[in-house]
Amino acid sequence: MRAAISEQLGYMRHIHDPVPESYFAVKRQLELRAAENDFATQEEYAALCEANGVTEPGDQAILLRFLHDLGNVLNYGDPDDPHKLQDTNILNPEWVTGGVYKLLNDRDLLQTGGVLERADVQRILGADPRYPPERHDFILGMMKKFELCFDIPDALGQSYLVPELLLPNEISLDWDFAQTLNFQYDYNVLPDGILPRFIVRMRTRWATGGNAGARA
């Protein structure tokens, strides 16, 4: 088994590329920082790179991808990403999941039928010093990226819909299935969260109406 793994590793791209010692110096500094900090801004990351000899922006970007792949730093940044996540480098993944679960598990929010207001975000996350106000948009952006919520149209960024928290009320609908095109998907095991994520992904179609069978 060891020999087979070694053989396959030899086929991987960049496996034999030399890695500058300065990259490991930055990696060690970030590991030390992670003991006391949940995240680092892009400006802080760039300063740390500069201090350890990684001065070119292109090299800093390559190193950040390297650290992301290793799991030392998680960065979901993309200049074209509408969620604007590139300025926050995650040193402690639990910080993100903890913030998300604070929102999803809030007792008052469970009564709103899935509607999350900006004031709710400030109330829930603002009670914990680990989530300063300037990082609230990042937590929301991560929820949008992973299809946990989306902006309610015409709410000017002040209201969001969290499908996972929709009330389980069913409506009575008289639908003539004989006159429509029907698709049926069968799962041996229905993955958790697939219907809420489906709602997020198809949100632009909900504006003109939609109906999903209750037996899914």
PLM regions: where:
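Extended, non-catalytic interaction/assembly segments in eukaryotic proteins
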Residues: 1-216
